[in-house]
C-alpha cells in the first residue's frame, strides 16, 4: 500500500515545479499500464523469485525502491520458485526454539525435538543471506573507491552519484542472492566484474542455504517421534503465527 500511494501520489520535486501529475509518478513507466499497476507488479515480482518488470525500478520513488529491496532481503513472504517453503522453514525452526525458551516448554516441531544443533544451522542459514549480499557490496565499493582505473576500464559502473549509487549496487547483489533478476538499471552491470560476481552470489545464495536446510531435515528425521503432551508448544495457533512473523520481521529485516 505504501508503494502504491508513493507512485500514485507523484514526485514531490516535480510538484514543486508546478507540473501536474494526474497519473502519478510516470518516470520509467509505460503509459498503457500507469503508476498503480507498475507499483503493484514491482512488489509482486520482488516478493517472489520472479524478476520480470513492467517499469524501471530505478525510477521508482525512494520508499518504493526500499520496499522492493526489502522484499528480496527478507526472501520469505511467499517464497521462491522451487524453494519457497525452505526459507520460511528456517524461520519456523528459530521461532520454535525462541518460543520454547520464552515459555519454558520443550521446543518441538512436527513431533521432533528442536535442539542446539538444529538451531545453530538455522542461525547460520539466516545469516548467510545478508552476509553474501553485503560481501558483494563491500567488494564493489572497495574497487570503486581504491581502484577507479579498474572501474573505468569496464566503462564505469555508477551513473548516479553518492547514496543512490550505493543503493544500485546493494539492489544488484540483493537481487542475485534472492534469485530474482530485476535491477536498478542506472548501474552499468553488463561487465565481466558484475556478471561473474552476481553469478557467484546467485549460486551461493541459492545452494548454501539448501545445504543447511536439508541438514536440519536430516537431523529431525533421525530423531524419535515425541507424542504431544501438556508441555508441547503448539505450532498451529495464531499466537505461534504472530511469533513466527515477529522472528521474520526482526531477523530477516535486520
State the predicted function of each range.
Residues 5-10, 104, 108, 141-149, ...:
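Transmembrane helix-loop junctions in multipass membrane proteins, especially transporters and channels
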Residues 126, 138-139:
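Short alpha-helix boundary/capping motifs
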Residues 8-83, 151-205:
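P-loop potassium selectivity filter motif centered on the GYG triad
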Residues 58-85, 97, 101, 107, ...:
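Non-catalytic terminal/interface segments that mediate subunit docking, oligomerization
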Residues 48, 130-133, 137:
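Helical transmembrane-bundle signal
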Residues 89-105, 113-131, 170, 177, ...:
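C-terminal transmembrane helix pair
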Residues 4-6, 121-122:
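Acidic/polar loop patches that form or flank catalytic/metal-binding clefts of enzymes
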Amino acid at each position: 500500500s505504501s508503494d502504491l500511494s508513493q507512485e500514485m501520489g507523484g514526485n514531490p520535486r516535480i510538484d514543486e515545479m508546478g507540473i501536474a501529475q494526474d497519473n502519478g509518478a510516470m518516470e520509467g513507466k509505460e503509459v498503457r499500464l500507469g503508476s498503480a499497476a507498475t507499483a503493484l507488479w514491482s512488489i509482486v515480482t520482488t516478493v517472489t523469485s520472479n524478476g520480470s518488470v513492467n517499469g524501471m525500478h530505478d525510477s521508482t520513488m525512494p520508499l518504493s525502491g526500499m520496499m522492493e529491496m526489502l522484499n528480496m532481503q527478507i526472501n520469505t513472504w511467499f517464497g521462491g520458485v522451487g524453494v519457497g517453503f525452505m526459507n520460511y522453514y528456517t524461520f519456523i525452526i528459530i521461532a520454535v526454539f525462541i518460543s520454547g525458551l520464552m515459555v519454558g516448554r520443550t521446543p518441538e516441531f512436527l513431533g521432533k525435538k528442536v535442539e542446539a544443533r538444529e538451531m545453530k544451522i538455522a542461525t547460520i542459514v539466516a545469516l548467510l543471506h545478508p552476509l553474501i549480499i553485503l560481501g558483494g557490496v563491500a567488494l564493489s565499493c572497495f574497487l570503486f573507491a581504491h581502484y577507479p582505473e579498474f572501474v573505468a576500464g569496464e566503462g564505469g559502473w555508477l551513473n548516479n552519484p553518492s547514496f543512490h549509487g550505493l543503493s544500485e549496487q546493494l539492489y544488484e547483489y540483493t537481487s542475485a542472492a534472492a534469485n530474482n533478476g530485476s535491477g536498478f538499471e542506472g548501474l552499468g552491470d553488463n561487465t565481466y566484474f558484475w556478471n561473474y560476481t552476481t553469478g557467484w552470489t546467485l549460486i551461493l545464495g541459492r545452494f548454501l542455504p539448501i545445504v543447511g536446510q536439508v541438514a536440519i531435515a536430516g537431523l529431525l528425521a533421525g530423531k524419535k517421534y515425541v507424542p504431544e503432551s501438556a508441555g508441547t508448544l503448539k505450532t498451529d495457533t495464531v499466537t505461534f503465527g504472530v511469533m513466527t512473523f515477529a522472528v521474520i520481521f526482526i531477523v530477516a529485516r535486520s
